[in-house]
């Protein structure tokens, strides 16, 4: 059996601050473009104005409004308020450093904190690139917020496995595959059926009994993928980021007939369509406060998910990439700036015979890791 060739990272979308996105010409890239240093990169974290790349050799490199590089790094997490860098410390400890982006990796950090990691998880089979765990700390007992108070403890009984931060809310996936949400809820992004805020992590009851494998937080929407490959999505649908019919795109002629299944408060299913048969106006969805079950074309199973501010990207079990939502800067990768309220496959990777393994979205851009098909 031949060894699998190393993969590469690709980028597309907004690059108005000079952050590396493939060719990086102008302020936007409309189609996936290889990163110049993509072969050596193993993790990517993108904020609005800059991106942090972590290499396999443990080096973090910044591109965009923030610049600089440093070695001895395990992970990095970029936000407009803070750059977090996890560095190897003495013995089993790791050192978490926080920097202001405009002075990142120069002089002394704003603050530093020693953490003792839990057992390191093995990479997926094949050794493909993994997305970092920050802002969840390696001890899984706390996380870091880009706004004060920066260090926020988590109840030990939560047994956090993954934590994602939106603009105003947080999602947590625990070791049992349950989802918790808290923070602002004015766009339904918490999934509890109301627009009320939650001060503490609250179990997402609509998904009880379903084991989730991944969660992702957009600016004001949320997505999770189950172990069986199902997608559940909720929150704000202003730009079609939920793949549900939205008035904004219908007025632009972008909405097409399709169907999605939602969950009522009692767990019963309700179906909504983009157009009804008699031509009557569609029941547009502005806010979806409960998880909706979303089917990809051809019944494809999802394995990875990431969200931008108002767009969503999903990787299927067969290595295809689907994107939808806000596309003004080409962040959907469809060679245009069209916004979509339905999942569309990114044909670039199909045409190039590439299998997508990972995706991570910045607010207005998207980064993808892919390998050549048939080389393993």
Curated annotation (Swiss-Prot):
Subcellular location field: Chromosome
Species this protein is from: Macaca fascicularis
Keywords, ordered alphabetically: Chromatin regulator, Chromosome, Hydroxylation, Repeat
Name of one Pfam family that matches: RCC1
Stretches forming RCC1 repeats: 6-56, 176-227, 229-317, 318-371
Known role: Plays a role in transcriptional repression of satellite repeats, possibly by regulating H3K36 methylation levels in centromeric regions together with KDM8. Possibly together with KDM8, is involved in proper mitotic spindle organization and chromosome segregation. Plays a role in regulating alpha-tubulin deacetylation and cytoskeletal microtubule stability, thereby promoting cell migration and TGF-beta-induced epithelial to mesenchymal transition (EMT), potentially through the inhibition of KDM8.
GO cellular component, as recorded: chromosome
A GO BP entry: chromatin organization
Location of region: Interaction with KDM8: 1-169
InterPro entries in alphabetical order: RCC1/BLIP-II, RCC1_domain-containing, Reg_chr_condens
Top-level taxonomic group: Eukaryota
Assembly and interaction partners: Found in a complex with KDM8. Interacts (via N-terminus) with KDM8 (via N-terminus).
Protein name (record): RCC1 domain-containing protein 1
(3R)-3-hydroxyarginine: residues bearing it: 141
């Amino acid at each position: 059996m031949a060894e699998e060739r190393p993969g590469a990272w690709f980028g597309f979308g907004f690059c108005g601050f000079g952050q590396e996105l493939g060719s990086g010409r102008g302020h936007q890239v409309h189609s996936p473009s290889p990163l110049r240093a993509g072969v050596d990169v193993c993790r990517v974290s993108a904020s609005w104005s800059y991106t942090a790349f972590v290499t396999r050799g443990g080096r973090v490199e910044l591109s965009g409004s923030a610049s600089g590089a440093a070695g001895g790094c395990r992970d990095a997490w970029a936000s407009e308020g803070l750059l977090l860098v996890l560095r190897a410390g003495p013995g089993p400890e790791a050192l978490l450093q926080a920097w202001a982006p405009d002075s990142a990796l120069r002089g002394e950090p704003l603050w530093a904190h020693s953490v003792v990691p839990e057992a390191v998880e093995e990479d997926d089979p094949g050794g493909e690139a993994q997305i970092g765990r920050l802002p969840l700390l390696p001890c899984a007992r706390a996380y870091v917020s880009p706004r004060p108070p920066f260090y926020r403890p988590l109840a030990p009984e939560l047994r956090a496995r993954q934590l994602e931060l939106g603009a105003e809310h947080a999602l947590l996936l625990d070791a049992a595959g349950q989802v918790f949400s808290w923070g602002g809820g004015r766009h339904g992004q918490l999934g509890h059926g109301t627009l009320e805020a939650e001060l503490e992590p609250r179990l997402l009851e609509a998904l009880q009994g379903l084991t989730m494998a991944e969660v992702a937080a957009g600016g004001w929407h949320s997505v999770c993928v189950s172990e069986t490959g199902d997608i559940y999505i909720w929150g704000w649908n202003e730009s079609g980021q939920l793949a549900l019919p939205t008035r904004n795109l219908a007025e632009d002629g972008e909405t097409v007939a399709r169907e999605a299944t939602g969950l009522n408060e009692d767990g019963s299913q309700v179906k909504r369509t983009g157009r009804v048969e008699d031509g009557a106006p569609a029941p547009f969805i502005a806010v979806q406060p409960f998880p909706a079950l979303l089917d990809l074309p051809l019944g494809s199973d999802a394995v990875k998910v990431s969200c931008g501010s108002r767009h969503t990207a999903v990787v299927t079990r067969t290595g295809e990439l689907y994107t939808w939502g806000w596309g003004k800067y080409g962040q959907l990768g469809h060679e245009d700036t069209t916004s979509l309220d339905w999942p569309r496959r990114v044909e670039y990777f199909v045409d190039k015979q590439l299998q997508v393994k990972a995706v991570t979205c910045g607010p207005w851009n998207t980064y993808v890791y892919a390998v050549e098909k048939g080389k393993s």
